[in-house]
C-alpha cells in the first residue's frame, strides 16, 4: 500500500509548474471562485484544490514554493482523511449474486469476521478485479435474507419465496455458523438437534457405541442385527399365540389338568414349559441384558430415562414379569382371584405390541417419521381440533334431519359422532347412513368438509418430512474417513498460506504494506 509520500511524488509528476499555465488557461476552469464542494470527512475535493491553486498562482507576491507547499499540504490532508475513512470501513462493497448486484458497507460485513463475507481472506476467492466486485453464482432471492443477517446484527429471516432447504444451503455456504442455523430452524418450527453425549470412561464408551450406534463398527452392526431378529421373533410369537388352534390346545390342557385335581406344581410346570413362554423368556433375557448394559454405561442417567426409546424398552419387558408373578400367585389362589388375574393379564399382554417400536432404534425411516410427527404436533393439533368441530356440527345436523324418520340410525347426537368421524375421514363403513333428503345433504357437506379439513395440514407435514429426510441424507454423505479429513485440512491451510500474498481491494485485507 502506498503511503502519503508516495502519493505526493505521484501527484508532482502529474501536476508540475511547467504545465501550470496550461491549467490556468484551460477554459474548463472558470475565473470565478466557486464554493468548495466537500468530500468525505469534510475535506475539499481534487477539483476544488486545482481551482484554489489557480487563484494562488494569479495572486500577487505568490511564488512557486509557497503555492506548491500549500497545495501539497492540503492535498496530503485530503488523502489522509480518505485513508482514515477507508480504514474505518466506510467504503462500499459491491456483491454480485448471479447478475444481481447488492451494495453495502464494509463495516456491515466486518461485524461477523468468521463468516464468508466477513473474512477478507475467504471472500477474496470470489473477487473480480476487472469489475471491482465480488461474484457469487448462488440463489439470488436468498441473498436478501443473508444480507439482512449482517444489517440487523445477527437476525436470520428466510424470504417468503425461498424454499426451506434452499435457504439452509445458503446459510451453510456463506458460513453464518451453527448459531444462525439453530435460529433459522427454531424460527421455522423445527426441533433443535440434541447434543451427542458420550461416556468419559473408555470402557463404557466402547459398550455405549456398541449398543447405541450400530454404524460405529462391524461389531455394533452385529449386535443390532441380533437385536432386530429378537424383536421380530418376539412379535411373531405375540401374534401366533392368539391363533385358535394354539389357544384351544392350551385351554384344553388346562381344563384336563384341573379336572384331574392336579397339584399347583403341575399347573405351574405346564405353564412354564409352554413353547411360547420359553421363547418369550429367551427374548426377555436379551432385552433385559441390552437395557441393563445401556443403563450402566450411559453418560447421563437422567437423560437415559428421558429418552423415549428407553421408555419403550422398559415398557416392553414389564408384561413378562407381571405375567410371571401372576402365574406364581395362581398356585395358591386357583379359584378366588383367577378371573381377575386373567383380565389383568390380557390388558398387560397388550402392551407387548409396543415392542414393534423397538425397531425404530435400528431404522432411519421410522426415526424420520417420528421426528416429522414431533415437529408437526401443532398442525396435527389443529387437524384434531377442526375434526372435533366438524363432528359436533354435522352429528347435530344429521340428528335433526333424521329425527322424524322411524327407522333412523341416529337416535341421539352422540350416536352420530361415529358416523361423522368415518364420513369426514372418507372411510365410510356403511353401518350408519342417512335415509332422508336432508340427511343426505348433510352427509354430502360432511364428506366435503372432511376432505378440505384433512388436506390443510398435509403440505406442512410433507415439507417437514422432506426436510428431515434430506438432512439425514446429507449427514450420511458427509461421513468421511479421518484420512480425508486430514487431507482437507492440509489443503485448506495451504490455500490460506497462498492467499496471504494477495493485495485485496474493494473491502479486501491488505497484508503487504509498502515500505517508506
Curated annotation (Swiss-Prot):
Would I find Hydrolase among this entry's keywords? no
Instruction: Give the organism's phylogenetic lineage.
Output: Eukaryota, Metazoa, Chordata, Craniata, Vertebrata
Location within or outside the cell: Membrane
Q: Which InterPro entries match?
A: BTB/POZ_dom (IPR000210), Ion_trans_dom (IPR005821), K_chnl_volt-dep_Kv (IPR003968), K_chnl_volt-dep_Kv1 (IPR003972), SKP1/BTB/POZ_sf (IPR011333), T1-type_BTB (IPR003131), VG_K_chnl (IPR028325), Volt_channel_dom_sf (IPR027359)
Recorded catalytic activity of this chain's protein: K(+)(in) = K(+)(out)
MF terms (GO), sorted A to Z: delayed rectifier potassium channel activity
Q: Annotated motif Selectivity filter: location in the chain?
A: 426-431
Specify the protein name: Potassium voltage-gated channel subfamily A member 10
